[in-house]
Amino acid sequence: MTTSEYGSRRSDDDQWDIVSGVGYTALLVAGWRALDTVGPQPLAPDEYAKYFIAASGDAYLNDQLAHPPTSVDETAFPRLYGVQTRFFDDFFRSAAAAGTKQAVIVAAGLDSRAYRLEWPSGTTVFEIDLPQVLEFKARVLQRHGVEPKARRNEVAADLRTDWPATLHAAGFEPGQPSAWSVEGLLPYLTADAQDALFARIDDLCAPGSRIATGALGSRLDHDQLVALEQTHPGVNLSGDVNFSALTYDDKTNPAQWLAARGWVVEPVRNTLELEAGYGMTPPAVDVRLDAIMHSEYIVATKP
C-alpha cells in the first residue's frame, strides 16, 4: 500500500490497524514526533517514536528519518505536532502536580507518555485503543527494554463499543478525580460519536476531573493543503494522506458542549498561540497551515 491509499473514504464500521486507515495516522504522527525530536529545538522530545517507525517497515517514514528534512517549510508538521505534544504533556504534568492519580488517554495510538513522563508514585495511566494497536506499542517498547514510569493499564476496546465497562474492569475508579486526553481524535468521529464519547467521559468523571482535547486540524480542507504544497515544490507536508477523506465535519464545538454541561472551560487556544506561549515566533508556513486546519486546544475542569 502506498501512502496515498491511506486516505480512503471512511465508513462508520470500518476497521484498521497501525499501518492502515485511521491507524496509519497514529504512525504518521509518531513519525512527525520522531522528526521533531531530532530537530534543532524539540518542544517535547520523544525518543521512543523512532522505534515504532522502524518496526512498522513503512518506507516513506523510514526514509524521512534516514534523511530528515531541514527547511522551515519541510519541518512544518513535525514542528506543529511537537507543539501539540507539548500541550498534552503539560496538561498531564499539571494534573499530576495537583494530585490526580488517574490519567486516561483516549485512542492512545502510539502515545508514549506512560513511558516518557515522570509520573508521581501511585499514578495509573489507562490507555484506550484497539488491541492490535496496544499490542504493537507494548511489543516494540519491550523489545527495546523501555519500561513505563507509571502503572500502565491497557484498555483494549473499540470506542464504538461499551468501552467504559472495559475501563472499569481495568481498575478505573470513577469516584476519584481523573485527567483525560482526547488528542487528535475528534476530526475522525461523526457528530453522534463525538457526543456519545463526551457523554460517557462526563459520566465517568468525578468532581475535580480534567479533560484536554484538541487537534492540529479540527477542520481540514485537503485541496487547500495540496495548493499550499504546490507553492513549495518538493515539500510534502501531509505525507500523501488525504485527511479530509478520513474526517467528519458538522459537529458541536467541544468547548461549547463541555460548558453546557457545567464544565469550566479555559480560553481556547490555537497552534499559533501555543507557539507564542512556548517562546516561538510562528513562521509564515505555520500561519498558513493554521488558517487551513483551524487548530484548537481546550482544557476544562469539572467542578
Curated annotation (Swiss-Prot):
One of its GO terms (biological process) is methylation. Keywords: Methyltransferase, S-adenosyl-L-methionine, Transferase. Its EC number is 2.1.1.-. It holds the Pfam family LCM. GO terms for molecular function: methyltransferase activity. SUPFAM superfamilies: S-adenosyl-L-methionine-dependent methyltransferases. InterPro entries: Ppm1/Ppm2/Tcmp (IPR007213), SAM-dependent_MTases_sf (IPR029063), SAM_mthyl_Trfase_ML2640-like (IPR011610). This is Putative S-adenosyl-L-methionine-dependent methyltransferase MMAR_2791. It comes from Mycobacterium marinum (strain ATCC BAA-535 / M).
